[in-house]
Amino acid sequence: MKKLVVLACLVLAIPNFAIQEANALDPNSVASIFDRLTSNKELANPSVIVIDEKTGEIVFEKNSTSPRKPASVLKLLTATAAYTYLQPTQRFTTSAFVGTKAKTLVIQGSLDPWISLIHTQAVKMGRTSLPRIEFSTLNALKKANNGSLRNITIYYTNLYSQDVANIQKFYFRHGVHAAMKRVTTEDAQSLSADQILSSDSPELQEILAFTLTWSDNLLAERIARLASAAAGHTSDDAGVGQTFDEVLNGLGIESKNLVTQDASGLSKLNRITAKQVGTLLIKIRENAKFAPLIGGLPIGGISGTLKDRFIKTAPQAVGLIKAKTGTLNGTSNLAGYVESGDREYAFVILADQLRKTHTAESLARNTVDRILGRIAFPILPGVIEEAPGQLGVTDQFGNQITTTN
């Protein structure tokens, strides 16, 4: 299956192109390429590490222990924490009920990170729709109380504060002053009468794959807090930081120099080293538990935040790179795996000292693409004679979705 995916990728990127059998670059050659190209001024003294996945040998490193801004590369740590402390097959259920008391309703949540504020998006992607909950509960309240909507109380459990605020705003816009009261799970059950609706999320591993593929910041933040709570810590930035430290230490990775202010990578105060990320990539590659995490990474020239990369800059690398992007103003990072024949290398490039211009960031991305293009080789003998029609690229839910990386 892996070879078929690579073949399709190459056909898409290089139609009518003769692909000769390629041998893996030996570690010395890889080191030479990185040594020469990472000195390029476009990368502005990056932090870099390359590790042979088969042997665990560090093939090349430059500033690898220098703390740098990870940007969305931090989501690798978020996903690792999720697979460490949460069940990948876990689903999140959100249900609404008419209350046992007059003029009340109950929303029983499970901290579903997948709830969507946009109904059309929710329908398209199989997400729990907050607007559906709002309209359905409003209509049920009207019916149960003969149209009277004064002095309404909404009891809820396990909802995010943002979702609670949105529900209250919805009711206010419709002329209803609803009192929102948080209760325990047990109380919510005892206060519930007839069910209005119930919605289940996909499995957590599917949500995580989407989070990594499209670099969804809100999902990353919510999932990290779920993992933090499961690890026995608080569900805030401090708790997430403790959880991330434990994840690294649990994998035998020194957590010194790790600074986290969030779980999405948006904070410019976050710090991590290329060596920490590179070692993490090797550790999760060795453990089958993390296979879905790696499967959720964007593929160069094919999917997610890498779908438009390598196609022009290094077409020979299309389909051969799985990596997490990380972009902030003045930062262009990439961390993941590159296939080189029968070898695979884990790589981390943290270029966080760029000039804060679109041109500088674009030049840095192109330079990174070309570096990896020098290393990437398929295990593909022979010649591709003719390319089939354009291949459609969608996410795992069958949708073409664009987000920031």
Feature roles, as predicted:
Residues 139-296:
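A small/polar active-site loop signature that marks catalytic segments
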Residues 59-61, 231-405:
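Small-residue-rich helix-loop
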Residues 13-67, 136-146:
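Beta-lactamase-like hydrolase cores
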Residues 1-4:
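Positively charged n-region of N-terminal signal peptides that target proteins for export
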Residues 56, 70-88, 211, 347:
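Active-site SXXK
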